UniProtKB/Swiss-Prot annotation:
Residues 133-142 have a biased composition (Basic and acidic residues). It is found in: Nucleus. One of its GO terms (cellular component) is nucleus. Residues 123-142, 153-194 are annotated as: Disordered. This is B3 domain-containing protein At5g18090. Residues 18-113, 209-301 bind DNA.
Length: 301
């Protein structure tokens, strides 16, 4: 049976379109990215050969390549995931796509409470106590968040075993200081290998299970920055959907992992996880990588 939440057509003679409901379990599937056949029939072959442009009410836009399988047309995964990630989507939002011509679509976003999203979602978290305009506030908060994450990603609390690995790496650097320059790369690889191992003092053994620990701050209730060291050692180098489980195995959440040169983070779907776990500022969260794209989260209040 066809899921009626995905890609249904909106009948308008002048501006045809379609809608989608963003179910977290299917955010990146071909079905979710699909374009209704009845809508495709109203588009010329020439238009279909071009990229489609998704434009939201505050002016931002995303070009997305159109792909095809034997059954239907759909949006390319990379561009679609970028659109979801940049707008923090993935919590049962209702989206309408209205065709304005030349494969340019106006996208209207309605939150789960029915309210239309008219400004970037993350701007709602910016403090309004000063007289600065919204753009200045948004730029400043992201600058502060990035600085906090850069500091925390290298702190001992951000990565179990980091203190031990750091001291071991320091001894290695001292012992290699008199060696030739051609051995530098080899020593870096050895240091990286040592730092990827965390020490478990309780059973006096080495644990190879990758994990990191973060203390929840205000920004982490919106999206979660991944510590730089952990990201370099264990995380994928492209946007990927992760499944995060609670310790009891009764609940799990699909969360979008966004990769870039400047910052890597969990975004679309993270707000829902934070709400349902009841995360608060000051909580300590430990994330254990149990599969390449699955994690276990433990929360200490």
């Amino acid at each position: 049976m066809k899921n009626k939440a995905f890609g249904q057509i909106m009948d308008d003679a002048e501006n045809p379109g379609f809608f989608k409901i963003l179910r977290s379990a299917d955010l990146s599937s071909e079905i979710m990215r699909g374009i209704p056949l009845n809508f495709i029939k109203s588009i010329s072959e020439e238009e279909l050969s071009a990229k489609m442009l998704l434009k939201v009410s505050w002016g931002s836009s995303w070009p997305i390549k159109i792909c095809r399988n034997p059954s239907f047309y759909f949006m390319e995964k990379k561009g679609w995931d970028q659109f979801l990630s940049d707008n923090g989507l993935g919590n049962d939002e209702f989206l309408t796509f209205t065709h304005q011509g030349n494969m340019c679509f106006t996208v209207d976003i309605y939150q789960i409470d029915g309210k239309e999203l008219l400004t970037p979602r993350r701007s709602a978290t910016i403090a309004s106590s000063s007289g600065r305009n919204k753009r200045e506030q948004r730029n400043n908060i992201y600058k502060d968040v990035k600085e906090e994450e850069d500091i925390e990603s290298w702190s001992e609390s951000s990565y179990p075993g980091h203190k031990t690995a750091e001291s071991t790496g320091r001894r290695q650097r001292l012992s290699l200081s008199n060696k030739k320059a051609k051995e530098t790369e080899k020593s870096k690889k050895k240091k990286m290998k040592v730092e990827s191992i965390s020490y478990d003092s309780q059973d006096d053994s080495l644990s190879l299970v990758p994990e990191f620990t973060l203390t929840i701050k205000k920004s982490y209730l919106i999206f979660l920055g991944i510590p730089k060291m952990f990201e370099e050692l264990h995380m994928p180098t492209e946007a990927t959907m992760f499944k995060i489980h609670d310790p009891e195995g009764k609940r799990s959440w699909d969360v979008m992992y966004k990769f870039s040169n400047n910052q890597t983070r969990f975004c679309a779907g993270w707000i829902r996880l934070a709400k349902e776990l009841g995360l608060e500022i000051g909580d300590v969260c430990t994330f254990t990588l149990i599969k390449p794209t699955e994690m276990l989260v433990r929360v200490s209040k």
